[in-house]
């Protein structure tokens, strides 16, 4: 048997040299990899059993010095049977092309990777790319067949520079290449595609590739802690080298894997092949079903270390952690705005592009997100999937339910940094912040009136334009405000009222009737810790506790006045808007509150539904009955701190305090005269107008005050309601009784 052909290889055939300029460009990990690969190549040649001297390259590396090649490095001419190539043919460093030699030793260039021309041919290539990179040799010996005839590799003479970092000096030393090695060519060799290292045994190549995988894991940290990190990394590297061969015929989107294309096509077909066995909800992907099942099982395996909040998915926890860190990794390329979530940036990009691909089939309105379209469609279907567990009220949006629940819990998470006042809604805090700076950002273009809220300004503008955008669905009548429409619809709702079976009281809504039925039950589970009073609902207890604490959380954005209850603030805001939606059908007088209209209607009907159980006297107003009952009991709970005088009603005490303070808030517009009591101003205005609204039905005489008319009627009837306790004498007027009592007071000292 003939001996196999051999090829002569030197160490420089598998070595790589850098200039000083190139060495500084390399990163630290690249320098380490370079040194490791050079040592490995040397050890591979040494392991073949041939004796040769250790190259200076390896010696300097062991001494910790950098190996640099000078600019004057050159290649020796090739010793072959044919004519050697010229210097012009070898000097390819500025061409950026590949330098190759064919069988006859003739050099030639190629734009692409070198390939073998046949089983008996071998190209030895040197990749010399770019003007800056002066890599003089990067060759790998490649073995093809046993019949390969003997060739000689380029014998090189290179000028090497040894650079010692400590001494900072350069020493130029011309070096001859070490002796050649006769390496027999095997039947097949295996080359590493990363570093071009050659192996004769395949398992050695596989073992060698693991070292690259470890180094790659350091470069790609997201694969480092995964149990399948290495396999995923190899798969990722393989995909990066491939093309996206699998294209969707519907949207022309391309994928690396056929399975990814099949998964994507489910979006176009609308298939949801994975149903949930618990709630019959269907999903496109099995992974989404698995995540959904965690909700039924109550599993939340991913917990936040900062606040303890748990999540179903790892990605949800990752997004949540950005709240604590403040990280916003997704930046808009148009305006440099940053976002915490990628989907937030995608929605933002539609503002730049103006694209709104999701259209409502009912009204034609467009949206940038599919979720926003689904939420909008609930307004057409009147679907309200989010209901309150306390009062049963339903909402279209989840965020509205969250805001409503704070009414029951009393939670106020938004605090003002200036005055530490807390608010239930974030928009209320924003409006409150404008009060500190005195800014009313929304101004009416007609009258320049300022508003804290845009909605308040729009409602105000309808007064100028006489626009009435709120029509009644029953009769078609239009209104400027939704509150006026709501009051009007009550006229139609009287035919659709829900009566209470216990007290025959009727309600316009079923939910109101449900709440009212709790009145007839004796259960009151919510008790006040201060006074022990019990309530049927937690919300009522929350409102009651504000009486003890003096808290007034609802502030009017117009005048800064505060209220304990939201309903009181809403009624107060109607005064600013000059809104009086409740009108009397008899005299066309309007009122802010429904209760005011109800009390007014009793003037026309003469109804007095409140009767005193002591004297059977009847009253038109419930407040008047309460004040009257205090006269029977002799109780006067409202006392003046100045003089100790007591009153049966709060407003009487308020009027009395003005006597001490000298305050006269009610001023006549005609003569600038001021009064402590509003009723006194009304009587005074009758003098200017000459009107006497209270007339006697017997003689037609008119009076300014109602009590004057009552006293006058006693003259016709002969009644003397005011009697003296001392002598029993009776009088028509209370003033006459007081004068008479003074007479008795003067007589008592004289008798002594």
UniProtKB/Swiss-Prot annotation:
Compartment list: Nucleus; Cytoplasm
Stretches annotated zinc finger (C2H2-type): 190-212, 246-268, 274-296, 302-324, 330-352, 358-380, 386-408, 414-436, 442-464, 470-492, 498-520, 526-548, 554-576, 582-604, 610-632, 638-660, 666-688, 694-716, 722-744
Any one Gene Ontology molecular-function term assigned to this protein's record: RNA polymerase II transcription regulatory region sequence-specific DNA binding
S-S bridge residues: none
Protein origin, superkingdom: Eukaryota
Pfam families referenced in this protein's UniProt entry, alphabetically: KRAB, zf-C2H2
GO cellular component: cytoplasm; nucleoplasm; nucleus
SMART domains to which the protein is assigned, alphabetical: KRAB, ZnF_C2H2
KRAB domain residues: 9-80
Keywords assigned by UniProt, alphabetized: Cytoplasm, DNA-binding, Metal-binding, Nucleus, Repeat, Transcription, Transcription regulation, Zinc, Zinc-finger
InterPro entries: aKRAB (IPR003655), Ikaros_C2H2-ZF (IPR050589), KRAB (IPR001909), KRAB_dom_sf (IPR036051), Znf_C2H2_sf (IPR036236), Znf_C2H2_type (IPR013087)
CDD domains: KRAB_A-box (cd07765)
Glycoprotein as UniProt keyword: no
Gene Ontology BP annotations: negative regulation of DNA-templated transcription; regulation of transcription by RNA polymerase II
Physiological role: Acts as a transcriptional repressor.
Similarity comment text for this entry: Belongs to the krueppel C2H2-type zinc-finger protein family.
Entry text on domains: The C2H2 domain is necessary for the transcriptional repression.
Name under which the protein is recorded: Zinc finger protein 425
Gene name of the record: ZNF425
């Amino acid at each position: 048997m003939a001996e196999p052909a051999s090829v002569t290889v030197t160490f420089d055939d598998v070595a790589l040299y850098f200039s000083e300029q190139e060495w500084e460009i390399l990163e630290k990990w690249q320098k380490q990899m370079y040194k490791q690969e050079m040592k490995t190549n040397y050890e591979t040649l040494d392991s073949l059993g041939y004796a040769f001297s250790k190259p200076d390259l390896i010696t300097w590396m062991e001494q910790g010095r950098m190996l640099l090649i000078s600019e004057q490095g050159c290649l020796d001419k090739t010793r072959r049977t044919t004519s050697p190539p010229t210097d012009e043919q070898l000097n390819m460093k500025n061409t950026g092309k590949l330098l190759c030699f064919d069988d006859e030793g003739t050099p030639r260039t190629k734009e692409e990777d070198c390939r073998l021309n046949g089983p008996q041919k071998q190209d030895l290539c040197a990749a010399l790319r770019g003007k800056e990179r002066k890599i003089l040799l990067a060759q790998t010996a490649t073995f093809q067949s046993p019949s390969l005839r003997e060739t000689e590799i380029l014998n090189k003479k290179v000028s090497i520079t040894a650079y010692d970092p400590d001494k900072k000096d350069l020493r130029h030393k011309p070096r001859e290449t070490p002796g050649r090695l006769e390496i027999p060519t095997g039947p097949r060799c295996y080359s590493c595609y990363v570093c071009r290292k050659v192996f004769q045994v395949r398992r050695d190549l596989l073992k060698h590739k693991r070292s690259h995988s470890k180094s790659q894991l350091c470069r790609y940290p997201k694969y480092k802690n995964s149990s399948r990190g290495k396999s995923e990394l190899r798969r990722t590297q393989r995909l990066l080298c491939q093309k996206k061969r699998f294209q969707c015929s519907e949207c022309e989107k391309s994928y690396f894997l056929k399975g990814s294309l099949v998964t994507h096509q489910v979006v176009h077909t609308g298939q949801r092949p994975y149903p949930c066995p618990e709630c019959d909800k269907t999903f496109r992907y099995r992974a989404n079903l698995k995540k959904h099942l965690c909700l039924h099982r109550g599993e939340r395996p991913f917990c936040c270390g900062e606040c303890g909040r748990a999540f179903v998915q790892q990605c949800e926890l990752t997004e949540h952690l950005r709240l604590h860190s403040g990280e916003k990794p997704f930046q808009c390329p148009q305006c440099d705005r940053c976002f915490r979530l990628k989907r937030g940036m995608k929605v933002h990009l539609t503002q730049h592009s103006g694209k709104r691909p999701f259209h409502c089939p009912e009204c034609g309105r467009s949206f940038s997100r599919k979720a926003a379209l689904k939420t909008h469609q609930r307004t057409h279907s009147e679907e309200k999937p989010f209901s309150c567990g306390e009062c049963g009220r339903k909402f279209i949006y989840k965020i509205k339910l969250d805001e409503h629940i704070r009414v029951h819990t009393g939670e106020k998470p938004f605090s003002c940094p200036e005055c530490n006042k807390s608010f239930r809604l974030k928009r209320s805090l924003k409006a409150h912040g404008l009060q500190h700076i005195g800014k009313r950002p929304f101004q009416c273009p007609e009258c320049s009136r300022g508003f804290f809220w845009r909605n308040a300004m729009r409602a105000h503008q309808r007064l100028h334009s006489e626009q009435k955008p709120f029509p009644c669905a029953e009769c078609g009548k239009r209104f400027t405000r939704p509150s006026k429409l709501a009051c009007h619809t009550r006229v139609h709702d009287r035919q659709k009222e829900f009566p209470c079976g216990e007290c025959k009281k009727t309600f316009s809504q079923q939910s109101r009737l449900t709440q009212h039925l709790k009145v007839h039950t004796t259960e009151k589970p919510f008790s006040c810790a201060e006074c022990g009073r019990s309530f049927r609902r937690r919300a009522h207890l929350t409102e009651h506790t504000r009486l003890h604490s003096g808290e007034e959380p609802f502030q009017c954005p117009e005048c800064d006045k505060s209220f304990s209850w939201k309903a009181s603030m809403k009624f107060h805001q109607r005064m600013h808007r000059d809104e009086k939606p409740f009108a009397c059908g008899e005299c066309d007088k309007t009122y802010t509150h429904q209760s005011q209209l109800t009390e007014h209607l009793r003037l026309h009907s003469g109804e007095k539904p409140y009767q005193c159980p002591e004297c059977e006297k009847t009253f038109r107003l419930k407040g008047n009955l309460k004040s009257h009952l205090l006269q029977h009991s002799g109780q006067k709970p409202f006392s003046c701190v100045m003089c100790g005088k007591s009153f049966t009603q709060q407003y009487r005490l308020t009027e009395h305090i003005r006597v001490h303070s000298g305050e006269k808030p009610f001023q006549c517009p005609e003569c600038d005269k001021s009064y402590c009591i509003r009723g006194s101003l009304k009587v005074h205005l009758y003098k200017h107008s000459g009107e006497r609204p209270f007339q006697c039905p017997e003689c037609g005489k008119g009076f300014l005050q109602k009590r004057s008319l009552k006293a006058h009627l006693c003259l016709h009837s002969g009644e003397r309601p005011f009697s003296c306790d001392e002598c029993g004498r009776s009088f028509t007027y209370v003033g006459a009784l007081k004068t008479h009592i003074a007479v008795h007071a003067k007589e008592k000292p004289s008798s002594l």
